[in-house]
């Protein structure tokens, strides 16, 4: 769930798979960007096909900001030894829209509860470290149309308001169509400015 007071969020820079071995057990941490629980479920279902001989595919995801949607699974490992440690890594790095699946090939030596927690956490940490993180910004899409005689004035005004070339896409047809990406941070700053202006006006007394 999105919180309109939050204008940015952290997400994985790229999908990534990272592997390490602990007491002959092979752990593969996989980071994926997801936008919904359904998308996460579809990706999770593919891992037994990708690694058909693996013993476990444990996972956790966190989606949205504010009251984020969080779920995790131990996938057959002892309760609390896999899913929660993986989710803890996602939260510790302040990531969202993030799914991590840790695949395990059992190597014949039991790791114990503490060993499993440490191994699944380490696999998730390694994958996140290699994937990297990027700061993303929420924005709204806006479509403007005007005549050709007004297009230059509109372009000048938009740039004066802080819209860069990357956020402006102009199409020319019977009229001029301008598609904008409006960052929520820009909307909030303008709302705050209007609120301050309104308070100043209301607080002015004639003498």
PLM segments and residue spans:
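Short amphipathic beta-strand starts and helix->beta connectors
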Residues: 11-16, 125-130, 154-167
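C-terminal regulatory domains involved in ligand/effector binding and gene-expression control
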Residues: 1-80, 196-207
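Terminal, non-globular segments
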Residues: 180, 185-189
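Short amphipathic alpha-helix segments
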Residues: 146-164, 188-191
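Short glycine-/aliphatic-rich beta-strand segments at the starts of folded cytosolic domains
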Residues: 134-150, 178-180
């Amino acid at each position: 769930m999105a919180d309109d007071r939050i204008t940015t969020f952290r997400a994985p820079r790229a999908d990534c798979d990272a592997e390490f071995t602990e007491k002959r057990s092979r752990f593969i941490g996989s980071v994926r960007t997801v936008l919904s629980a359904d998308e996460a479920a579809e990706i999770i279902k593919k891992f037994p096909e990708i690694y058909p001989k693996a013993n476990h595919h444990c996972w956790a995801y966190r989606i949205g900001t504010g009251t984020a949607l969080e779920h995790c699974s131990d996938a057959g490992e002892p309760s609390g030894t896999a899913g929660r440690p993986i989710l803890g890594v996602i939260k510790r790095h302040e990531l969202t829209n993030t799914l991590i699946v840790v695949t395990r090939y059992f190597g014949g030596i039991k790791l114990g509860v503490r060993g499993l927690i440490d191994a699944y956490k380490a696999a998730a940490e390694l994958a996140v470290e290699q994937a990297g993180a990027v700061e993303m910004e929420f924005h709204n899409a806006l479509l403007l149309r005007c005549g050709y005689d007004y297009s230059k004035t509109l372009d000048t005004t938009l740039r004066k308001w802080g819209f860069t070339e990357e956020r402006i896409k102009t199409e020319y047809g019977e009229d001029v169509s301008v598609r904008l990406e409006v960052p929520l941070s820009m909307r909030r700053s303008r709302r705050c400015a209007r609120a301050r202006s309104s308070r100043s006006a209301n607080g002015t007394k004639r003498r």
